[in-house]
């Protein structure tokens, strides 16, 4: 957003279209290898990703696909085919086909915006999108306080001119002003379309106040059927943000950490000590409840001190 490079709100929101950016990682890596970058105060290489420097598809590092208006979230479909960009200040979502963007980089697509295969109205204040693996997208509508379920293929058909294509499948009220959203394994090839979680930025009357910070609301929704069903509310900290849902059997748990995985770990309290190299001082110590291997240590004013603490409780 703010492709206008504005400072005031009225300037930042003056353009009807902004941009969704796609980065050509291979070209960026080649540019860095060739020394075509700058540094600003550190050694991190910074390539030129400005719009002016990336208009020629043959050399572009970045593709600027135009989207309306002050776009917010962009999310990839489980098959990796489409990227859905939410309009925020536009009641639309823009569906961009990745292969067409790659065709533009390769000189096979003349107009970059021809990678837009759908741009449809879904509601007021679209922010983020999740997927069920069955071809449906779920977008949060901040101003409408809703989640809208819509079918991507039907949206593409509608965009092409089929006005009989009913792309909106369902809507459900949430409480209130939803932002981040995710479905079970949503942006992976294993999306299973069972559950949806949504972070609502305001709970309003949903929970009793418990102190200076009023709890906001995360809601769990069943998306296994045609209609969405609200299952549960959960009070959460303010401004709930990104989260994922995944199957617990893919987690490989550990009961005890392997100290060999940490090259700086102190494996024995006898290795504790203060080690000086000029003004650089490294302090190594261990802890094992309720004590530390060193209760105190002394350094000089002006020293640069690195403290390495390893817990040896079992």
Regions found by a protein language model. Give the residues of each.
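Predominantly soluble domains enriched in secretory-pathway, periplasmic, or organellar proteins
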Residues: 1-273, 280-282, 304
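Extracytoplasmic copper-binding redox domains, predominantly the cupredoxin/blue-copper superfamily
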Residues: 263-314
């Amino acid at each position: 957003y703010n492709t206008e490079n504005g400072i005031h709100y009225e300037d930042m929101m003056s353009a009807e279209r902004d941009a969704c950016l796609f980065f050509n990682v291979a070209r960026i890596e080649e540019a860095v290898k060739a020394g075509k970058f700058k540094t600003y105060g550190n050694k991190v290489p910074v390539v030129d990703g400005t719009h002016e420097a990336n208009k020629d598809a043959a050399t572009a590092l970045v593709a600027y696909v135009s989207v309306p208006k002050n776009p917010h979230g962009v999310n990839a479909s489980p098959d990796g085919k489409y990227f859905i960009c939410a309009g925020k200040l536009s009641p639309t979502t823009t569906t961009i086909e990745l292969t067409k963007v790659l065709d533009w980089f390769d000189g096979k697509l003349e107009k970059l915006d021809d990678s837009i295969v759908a741009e449809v109205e879904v509601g007021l204040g679209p922010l983020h999108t999740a997927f069920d693996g069955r071809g449906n997208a779920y977008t949060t509508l901040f101003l409408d306080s809703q989640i809208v379920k819509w079918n991507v293929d039907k949206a593409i058909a509608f965009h092409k001119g089929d006005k009989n294509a009913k792309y909106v499948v369902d809507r459900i009220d949430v409480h209130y002003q939803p932002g981040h959203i995710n479905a079970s394994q949503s942006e992976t090839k294993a999306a299973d379309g069972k559950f949806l979680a949504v972070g609502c930025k305001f709970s309003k009357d949903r929970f009793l106040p418990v102190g200076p910070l009023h709890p906001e609301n995360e809601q769990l929704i069943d998306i296994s059927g045609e209609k969405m069903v609200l299952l549960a509310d959960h009070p959460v900290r303010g401004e709930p943000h990104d989260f994922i849902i995944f199957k617990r059997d893919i987690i490989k748990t550990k009961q005890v950490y392997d100290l060999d995985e940490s090259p700086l770990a102190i494996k024995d309290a006898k290795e504790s000590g203060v080690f000086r190299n000029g003004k650089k001082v490294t302090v190594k110590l261990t802890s094992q409840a309720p004590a530390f291997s060193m209760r105190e240590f002394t350094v000089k004013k002006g020293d640069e001190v690195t403290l390495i603490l390893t817990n040896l409780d079992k």
